[in-house]
């Protein structure tokens, strides 16, 4: 099996220092430099999720810059690889990184099946994974880990914020179009629970393979169901394709609503506002939310000329918090001590205010409900959302005692 080549980035080179005398140092002796701290980002950099994950390495670079380029005197080196949305590929990369390359932390990990596979290896090795891309709430439930974190969003929060809002707006009957792997199944499960709890009903559903090109048969079933809402429990190019083809079938014009249950700003830009206008969705980050997000985005665009997604911002946030914790502990070698420090320290950065990393690994943060603007409301190509509501983290995320995490007694 061919493992994707690592793309390496060394943390900012610190200014060369003069020799420091410790006891008697021979003239001309060069002080040994400590080995770099190696961290890594693994994601679906090609294929169905490629557009979402572009820029994650640059986001990690920004986090390294924001701790001064070094941690406890050590430079920071980034490794990067594409897991191709295949759990076996992701697992092989993780093992090599941990066993051969000496990586101390892996982040990214979009695609829940890959994240679950890497989580097992990280736990086995006693090393840290911070999952920013995968959505399955099982990652802070049955698959929680003492050295694992689930950082940006999960299926429970997406269901709670988007699903509840649509049911309250009258969308009380649902049909699901679901990606047939762990993420899609978890999202359908969690949204169904919210719909039923709010007094709605699920009238049916159909599952599709990852990277489906033709959704016609699935959309015809959804149309025939007469459900008020068609829930799209998929992501990336699958979401884009299904929304475009739903438009061709006249589904929205016929009175049914589409619920994009995991939609990113990059998806909306690919769809264009005439196609996506009116779509209600949940995100943890939007570049135009406030002055701080706008300033961060300007800095990011100097490295990567594109609109950052919440995945990009999430990789920045996870990396920054990890590096701060390592700095505070003094070493990355004891993962349990680093994780304890990460839980102790509140998370405060461009996308999170007073976030709390719980014992089950769930980062509790505020989530934002947006609606896609109509073309007439948009001032420029990146002006795509209007804020409907901000939901506090303790309302958006599953209560600690309900997740079935074996670490919680």
Regions found by a protein language model. Give the residues of each.
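Extracellular/periplasmic periplasmic-binding protein-like sensory domains
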Residues: 243-318, 327-333, 376, 383-408
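Short beta-strand segments enriched in small/hydrophobic residues
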Residues: 35-52, 173-177
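Periplasmic-binding protein-like
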Residues: 97, 101-110, 130-132, 175-178, ...
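Solvent-exposed, acidic/polar segments of extracytosolic/periplasmic ligand-binding ectodomains
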Residues: 37, 346-409
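Short, low-complexity disordered leader/linker segments with a strong preference
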Residues: 1-38, 404-409
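Venus flytrap/periplasmic-binding-protein-like
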Residues: 83, 137-140, 210-211, 252-276, ...
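Extracellular/periplasmic Venus flytrap/periplasmic-binding protein
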Residues: 92, 137-140, 145-249, 285-295
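Beta-alpha junction/loop-to-helix N-cap segments that form part of ligand/metal-binding clefts
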Residues: 51-58, 66, 70-141, 151, ...
């Amino acid at each position: 099996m061919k493992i994707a080549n690592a793309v390496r980035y060394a943390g900012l080179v610190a200014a060369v220092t003069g020799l420091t005398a410790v006891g008697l140092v021979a003239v001309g002796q060069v002080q040994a430099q400590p080995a770099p701290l190696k961290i890594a980002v693994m994601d679906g950099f090609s294929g169905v999720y490629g557009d979402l994950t572009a820029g994650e390495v640059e986001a990690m670079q920004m986090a390294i810059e924001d701790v001064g380029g070094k941690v406890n005197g050590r430079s920071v080196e980034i490794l990067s690889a594409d897991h191709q949305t295949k759990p076996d590929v992701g697992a092989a990369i993780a093992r090599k990184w941990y066993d051969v390359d000496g990586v101390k932390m892996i982040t990214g990990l979009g695609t829940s099946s890959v994240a679950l596979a890497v989580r097992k290896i990280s736990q086995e090795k006693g090393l840290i994974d911070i999952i920013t891309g995968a959505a399955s709430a099982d990652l802070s439930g049955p698959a929680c880990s003492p050295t694992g974190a689930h950082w940006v969003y999960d299926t429970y929060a997406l269901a709670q914020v988007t699903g509840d809002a649509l049911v309250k707006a009258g969308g009380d009957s649902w049909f699901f179009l679901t990606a047939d792997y762990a993420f899609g199944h978890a999202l359908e499960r969690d949204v169904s629970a919210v719909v039923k709890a709010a007094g709605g009903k699920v009238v049916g559903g159909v599952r599709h393979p990852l990277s489906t090109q033709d959704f016609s048969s699935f959309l015809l079933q959804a149309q025939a169901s007469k459900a008020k809402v068609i829930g799209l429990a998929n992501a990336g190019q699958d979401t884009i394709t299904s929304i475009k083809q739903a438009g061709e079938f006249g589904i929205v014009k016929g009175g049914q609503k589409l619920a994009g249950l995991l939609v990113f700003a990059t998806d909306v830009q690919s769809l264009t506002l005439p196609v996506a206008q009116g779509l209600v969705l949940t995100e943890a980050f939007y570049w135009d939310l406030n002055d701080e997000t706008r300033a961060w985005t300007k800095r990011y665009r100097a490295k990567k000329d594109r609109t950052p997604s919440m995945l990009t911002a999430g990789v920045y946030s996870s990396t920054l918090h990890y590096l701060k914790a390592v700095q505070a502990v003094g070493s990355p070698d004891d993962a349990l001590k680093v994780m304890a420090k990460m839980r102790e320290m509140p998370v405060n950065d461009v996308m999170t205010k007073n976030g709390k990393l719980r014992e089950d690994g769930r980062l509790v943060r505020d989530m934002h409900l947006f609606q896609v603007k109509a073309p007439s409301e948009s001032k420029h190509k990146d002006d795509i959302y209007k804020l409907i509501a901000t939901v506090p983290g303790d309302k958006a995320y599953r209560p600690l005692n309900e997740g079935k995490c074996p670490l919680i007694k």
